[in-house]
Amino acid sequence: MATPLVRKPAVPSRTARAGAGPAPPRRVSLSLLLPALCAVLLVSLVCGAGIGASGLSWSEVLRCLWAGLTGGRIAPDQVPAYTIVWELRFPRAVLAAVVGAGLSAIGVAVQAMVRNALADPFVLGISSGAAVGANAVLIFGAFGTLGIWALSTASFLSALLAMMLVYAIARTARGLTPLRLVLTGTAMYYGFSAVTTFMVFAAERGEAARSAMMWMLGSLGGADWASVPIAAGAVLGGLAHLAWSARRLNALAMGDETAAALGVDAGRLRKELFLVSAAVTGAVVAVSGAIGFVGLMVPHAVRMLVGADHRRLLAVAPLVGAVLLIWVDILSRVVLAPAELPVGVLTAVIGVPCFVLLMRRRSYTFGGA
């Protein structure tokens, strides 16, 4: 009986394998990445409290942090160190983490909302609207009766007014469309920026104009414990809503028709995302100024690590953004000590080359492939 011939499967040639395209990149396991990022965040917070021009020892820094966290007593000779660590540096590090987390998460949401790889939290024009209120306080003394709350209150109120204006112009009978949102937000950005620039040039030269310019470039120099709860509450609320909407974000990122086929109301979801993004951006910008590039760069970098699934993106991006902004703020304090650089300047200096390197990678696409 003849033995049947079994044809061996052909082995693809090297040329054929090369022409098949790059293999999909490996994704980092969240079970390893999340604990590592949490540990790095804690270390970064301690470093943010310990690094500065005053030259405190690490034992003093840890002692002051422990006293502040537990409510313990400190020796009279340690009061200056305690003031520096607990009242000045540590709230600043915490606020940097909150702002970085908020900008990164909203960057992910806005890019999905408008399906544009160049979108960031400021594309909606909210930050430039907040700058109008901030400059009114810094230059002209508006809301002076509110004391320390004047700057954040005026910034947040003007951000809300900007949000309402953008929404009113961009909205149509079909709801909010990505193109109208981007175009309206961009137009409002330039319009509000022109107003703030005019306010700075109309002001008398001096400390007020300098403070306004620092705020417009982003600064955490005015951070204190009073400014943390409002920003943290807005960011945590926004993160909770985005995490709950992660599956719908995956559908929206594939297009309105695909989202509708999957049972997702794209118009309603886009409206929710707009309101959440505007509220979080307004709260964050009110306490930190306009810190750019974090909400643009971090989402793209995280996509390369964990892919385009928004459930993974929204778990990792806030932690990466928090760590990034803590260390950028540390650099802003020590590069030209005792002078201080605007945080937004350093985020651009660091972000531009990093972003260019990301875009140079052949395997990277906006969808995370």
Features from the language model and the residues they span:
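Alpha-helical transmembrane segments in inner-membrane proteins
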Residues: 2-369
